[in-house]
Swiss-Prot record:
It is an enzyme of class 4 (lyase). One of its GO terms (molecular function) is magnesium ion binding. The gene is eno. Its main location: cytoplasm. Its EC number is 4.2.1.11. This is Enolase. Its cofactor is Mg(2+). Catalyzes the reversible conversion of 2-phosphoglycerate (2-PG) into phosphoenolpyruvate (PEP). It is essential for the degradation of carbohydrates via glycolysis. (2R)-2-phosphoglycerate binds at residues 165, 339, 368-369, 390. Belongs to the enolase family. GO terms for biological process: glycolytic process. Mg(2+) binds at residues 244, 287, 314. It comes from Xylella fastidiosa (strain Temecula1 / ATCC 700964). The lineage of its organism: Bacteria, Pseudomonadati, Pseudomonadota, Gammaproteobacteria, Lysobacterales.
Length: 430
């Protein structure tokens, strides 16, 4: 029933108007699964390779015809007749078929599209929603994740002068995901009013957050605090704050260059800067606080505030189990961001989440800045031991689609639905 009969890929557009790959896997019983692959703007140097054509006369060189051809050719030839229910076996066959450490021959976008589409197909064949099927593939908790809502965009995600890439609200003080989502939405709309009142732009960035020209990163935090209050919530109780510093993007010649603050800081000084922010604001999570190659700085940051703040490795770990294990062994960070296209298969993604759970690191399932209407990450966040999800702001359909899928899952779980809330950070001490 779950033997693969056909594999097909096509070139579609992502939320930035760039080409990406969509794969379809059809089983012998004619059931079909479909998945689309996202794309990042700020990327870690150790990420799996996203295969682009490089033909400047077509889509400015960003076409993915080669990856599509790889799916329709060598990958389809190798997997037609394979039992899609053997997800681990299928993914290992994909990895071996590529034969490179970084999936650079066939492309991580080609491999991931097929890997995810197969899971969708098998779930449909079993008449199960994806989250229910995925819960049978590994460690599972079936709880609704805390949304890390990116309501102000900066850095590589916006054309403004804000250094930090994301300013997020985390609605932790609520009994259900739906209530948390409502709170985040109301704060988002309150923030729009705050920005208008300050004469600032309410245009949005790649991930749906506002992208005004604040004079500093601290100004952005102050605006969010005002919005939380205007919406009728209490910062530090109902809602906590999160940052994606994406510091690799503004580190040059060993110094962290903060344009708004007019500062060029050493690693030690930047650790002090982040520590001061945590003391002044109800910040519970900092992602990529130090550059991906600044492991000495990461160690200092972890020792300084890792007991009370979630320190998330994104560019640092790139969802790669080998790199992640080095970080665990070294005592670097205490959480990992899970981006499927950083590693390239569903099995490796689930392995990274399971590794985090065993090491008592938090796992956050994440979108990319170039997204599609695909909602797979919502199902993965519910089905695994991940406690949080990053899928952007409260506008743009490519972001809201994931939130809406989580609402559907919460309703499907009924009285058994559990929202992670503050329990997502139970290992941290105030």
């Amino acid at each position: 029933m779950t033997v693969i009969a056909k594999i097909y890929a096509r070139e579609i557009l992502d939320s930035r108007g760039n080409p990406t790959l969509e794969a379809e896997v059809t089983l012998e019983n004619a059931v079909c699964g479909r998945a689309a692959v996202p794309s990042g703007a700020s990327t870690g140097t150790k990420e799996a390779v996203e295969l682009r054509d490089g033909d400047k006369t077509r889509y400015l060189g960003k076409g993915v015809r080669a990856a599509v051809d790889n799916v329709n050719g060598v990958i389809a030839a190798a997997l037609v007749g394979f039992d899609g229910a053997d997800q681990t076996g299928l993914d290992h066959r994909l990895i071996n078929l590529d034969g490179t450490e970084n999936k650079g021959r066939l492309g991580a976008n080609a491999l991931l599209g097929v890997s995810l589409a197969t899971a969708h197909a098998v779930a449909a064949a079993r008449k199960q929603p994806l989250w229910m099927y995925l819960s049978t593939l590994g460690e599972s908790k079936l709880s609704l994740p805390v949304p890390m809502m990116n309501i102000i965009n900066g850095g590589a995600h916006a054309d403004n002068n804000v250094d930090f890439q994301e300013f997020m609200v985390l609605p932790v003080g609520f009994a259900s995901f739906s209530e948390a989502l409502r709170a985040g939405t109301e704060i988002f709309h309150a923030l729009k009013s705050v920005l208008k009142g300050q004469g600032l732009s309410t245009a949005v960035g790649d991930e749906g957050g506002f992208a005004p020209d604040f004079r500093s990163n601290v100004e952005a935090l102050d605006a969010i605090l005002e919005a939380i209050g205007r919406a009728g919530y209490i910062a530090g109780e109902d809602v906590l704050l999160g940052l994606d510093v994406a510091s690799s993007e503004f580190r040059n010649n060993g110094k962290y260059n903060l344009v708004g603050e007019n500062k060029r800081l050493t690693s030690e000084q930047f650790v002090d800067f982040l520590d001061d922010l945590v003391a002044q604001y109800p910040i519970i999570s900092i992602e990529d606080g130090l550059a991906e190659d600044d492991w000495v700085g990461w160690k200092q940051l972890t020792e300084r505030i890792g007991h009370k703040v979630q320190l998330v490795g994104d560019d640092l770990f790139v969802t790669n189990p080998k790199v992640f294990q080095e970080g665990i062994t070294s005592g670097i960070a205490n959480a990992i961001l899970i981006k499927l296209n950083q590693i390239g298969t569903l099995t490796e993604t689930l392995e990274s989440i399971a590794m985090a759970h065993r090491a008592q690191y938090a796992a956050i399932v994440s979108h990319r800045s170039g997204e599609t209407e695909d909602t797979s990450i919502a199902d993965i966040a519910v089905a695994t031991t991940a406690t949080q999800i990053k899928t952007g702001s409260l506008c743009r359909s490519d972001r809201v689609a994931k939130y809406n899928q989580l609402l559907r899952i919460e309703q499907a779980l009924g009285v058994g639905a559990r929202y992670a809330g503050r329990d997502a950070f139970v290992s941290l001490k105030s």
